[in-house]
Amino acid sequence: MCDKDRFKVIIVGGSVAGLTLAHCLQRAGIDHVVLEKNSDLSPQVGASIGIIPNGGRILDQLGLFDAVERMTYPLSIATITYPDGYSFRNNYPKTVDERFGYPIAFLDRQKFLEILHTSYPDPSNIHTNCRVTHIRRHDSHMEVVTSSGQEYTGDLVVGADGVHSVIRSEMWKLADALEPGRVSKREKRSMKVEYACVFGISLPVPGLKVGDQVNAFHDGLTIITIHGKNGRVFWFVIKKLDDMYTYPDTVRFSSADAVRTCENIVHFPLVNGATFGHVWENREVTSMTALEENIFNTWYADRIVCIGDSIHKMTPNIGQGANTAIEDATVLTNLLYDRLSKNGHKKLARQELLQLLREFQSQRFRRVNKIYQDSRFLVRLHARDGIVKSLLARYIVPYMTELPADLASKSIADSPTIGFLPLPSRSGPGWLQWSRKQRRPATPWILVLLVIVVSFGLHSPELVIPTFWSNSLVSKTVE
């Protein structure tokens, strides 16, 4: 079969979503290219990345998890602190590891991207300095055009270009042309910004033990520190803004804003005598950004589809942003592999491809929306946003000792895997025990607690019970 007759994917964006998709497609034998606007595939911008079992298992299928594990130290204990000096410890990270056979672990985002691109077997498929400006639609294919005038032809364009996605905008234009009104003005302005984050990486700090995590809850602000391999501290300062912004008319931050935010909280305590000031003094890199929140309703149009942050964006509190992007790449590849392996990897008819993309959104939307809603609630719970959430965080959460591990387990257990690759030998009982079909009704005391919580907040507009609370309070897994 001639190359021109083979189905080809153009991936726009060479970060977590795009490079993971490239690995998946490579293993599936599906032709593809990656177009990345920057010259460096793994820049150091001060960010870290958390790999949770649902992402870790997929990376293991791709033969990448061993490299990740060598650069990380598994989390085992989380300490939660409050402004009144109260604190408690919870071993939910260790419990999650034991249940699923994979740890919760953090590393430099730069190092993770290095793993993805240096282990990719065919570098000629990855093109840097390719800033995509627009897409031309033809009856039989799509043409992607870059700022330098280069043209790339393919059958499916995948937008993996992040929250400021050019491909999402091009997809909207195409949808408006083919089906006027399909993407409403409301959807185009549905991404909001209510929080900002200063994130960074610091050298080891005395008192911050390797493998531990600290969540310091304050009014309108949360400090999260994760103590990784060799004592390196990955940290986030997440604060509520005075105003809500609507994307793209959002707020931008300078290095001076980051300094001002952090220097105002240097006296905030963490654990074992360490303060945030010690973390700040030992910083290596830092940056500040707005935290966009949204899950869009339109994920595809014609021969364009978006994955990862380009179509669903959540705060870092839940640690699932990168992992859901890895899942997106997995599900899209599974669907393509199922179709193409049956026709010899020939081009798909337009209607056949549209059906595939409908199936992709259908499979992903419900799961991602649940994780997104959980993330929305957690960022506000952590920041003690309002009296009800303040009371929940302070007087109820500390006494529901199994809740963090149970919530994490529910979001992990039903995650997808690469269907055409064998499952890894390492595993744990949690994949089966915490899947939806294995859950049974909760114990009565949990239902009583739910009644108390709801009764307290019945007349408060601030109380919105998220999906993970409602599910965890009315169902529990068979152990």
UniProtKB/Swiss-Prot annotation:
Supply the name of the protein: FAD-dependent monooxygenase atmM
Q: Which gene encodes it?
A: atmM
- Protein's pathway: Secondary metabolite biosynthesis
The cofactors named for this UniProt entry are:
FAD
| Protein family | Belongs to the paxM FAD-dependent monooxygenase family.
Q: Which UniProt keywords apply?
A: FAD, Flavoprotein, Membrane, Monooxygenase, Oxidoreductase, Transmembrane, Transmembrane helix
Where's it mainly located?
A: membrane
Q: Which Gene3D superfamilies match?
A: FAD/NAD(P)-binding domain (3.50.50.60)
Q: Which domain of life is it from?
A: Eukaryota
Subcellular location(s): the record lists: Membrane
Instruction: Work out whether the entry's keyword set contains Transcription.
Output: no
